[in-house]
Amino acid sequence: DLTGRADVVHKLADVGAAIASGSFRTLGMIVAPCSVRTMSEIATGVTSNLLTRAADVVLKERRPLVLMVRETPFHLGHLRTMTALTEMGAIIAPPLPAFYARPGSIEDIVDQSVGRALDLFGLDWSAVRRWDGLKGAPEA
């Protein structure tokens, strides 16, 4: 239950919440998972709920916005939307498995994806298995 772990929980319709304002300080925002609909609303400035409003604020304040887009495959419209968001300063980071880490479970895959997203904020997640190079590879 994630709600029990949160310091504050807002309702999606609560567009008057503090995080809907640029004066509310954050390190940025991670949207995980991010649907194509949410991604599209953020890209076009549609702020129909607190999630898209908060993301819009993060972009306008030039803070990191990481969108872990979940749908695949992508069509050209999705790719153009991702390009537009990247040009606005967002980071598109689909939650893809890092097979070099040899995940043994879904939890391992989730931990690796979360860790990679937190890395973008300079935050350490001990569950991340980091690449340490090829063993026995000749030095250049």
Regions found by a protein language model. Give the residues of each.
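A cross-family phosphate/adenosyl-ligand binding-site feature
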Residues: D1-V66, T72-A140
